[in-house]
Regions:
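Class I (Rossmann-like) S-adenosyl-L-methionine-dependent methyltransferase catalytic domain
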Residues: 1-111, 127-215
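A conserved beta-strand element that flanks and buttresses the S-adenosyl-L-methionine
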Residues: 119
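Short catalytic micro-motifs in class I SAM-dependent methyltransferases
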Residues: 122-126
Length: 215
């Protein structure tokens, strides 16, 4: 059985929100993300979210950062975009935001501007290995300064890996297509335990782009 991302996510998008379970790992993911965003000097006013799903991260950012004045949320699934619209329009926001929702995959997406922050949560892990380099190159063109992707990451892929999940070497791929002065960091998402920490196998990858011409 092969994995076709477009077909898979169009079908899964119809039932994703209904089957979604908000657990302690999702909550921890959000806590780590907010803590990390709070550590970034300055503010981000424009945000591009790719693979927004039903709007979980969209809502998280819009309710926590009143500096955001423009937000574009994109997803491959028309059903998920409708879910995201419903969630956000029913959410009280701290300020007025220019909001736009768009149905598109990343490969087909065309934009006429760059965004302060490009963010993806559990999206790139579903990109085929043959496509990941071209996708990351597009992310770099979309971003004015920051790219953040939150994804499953292990040193070695598990034996029973699902057909729609892939481990990519994000740091190495970002490094290939950015200036040497670009900052690339990985923040493992770990849960505290009584005698230490438990790795959730997820990480925040943060790229701070230097767009000066490469020598």
């Amino acid at each position: 059985m092969s994995y076709n991302p477009s077909e898979y996510w169009h079908e899964r998008g119809k039932i994703y929100k209904k089957n979604f379970r908000y657990d302690k790992n999702k909550r921890l993911q959000e806590e780590f993300l907010i803590a990390h965003l709070n550590s970034i000097p300055g503010s981000f006013k424009s945000v591009l979210e790719l693979g927004c799903g039903f709007g979980r991260i969209t809502q998280l950012l819009l309710t926590n950062y009143s500096t955001i004045t423009e937000y574009l949320a994109v997803d491959i699934s028309p059903d998920q975009i409708e879910n995201a619209k419903t969630l956000i329009t029913s959410t009280k926001l701290p300020n007025e935001v220019k909001l736009d929702f768009r149905v598109s995959d990343i490969q087909s997406l065309k934009l006429d501007k760059e965004y302060d922050l490009v963010i993806l949560s559990e999206v790139l892990l579903h990109i085929l290995p043959t496509d990941i380099d071209s996708i990351i190159k597009k992310l770099i063109t979309f971003s004015k300064k920051h790219i953040i992707n939150i994804d499953w990451y292990e040193d070695e892929p598990p034996k029973n890996q699902a057909l729609h999940n892939f481990i990519h070497q994000y740091e190495a791929i970002y490094k290939k297509y950015t200036n040497p002065s670009t900052t690339i960091k990985r923040i493992p998402i770990k849960r505290k335990k009584f005698l230490g920490t438990l790795d959730t196998k997820q990480s925040i990858f943060h790229v701070i782009i230097d767009k000066n011409p490469m020598n």
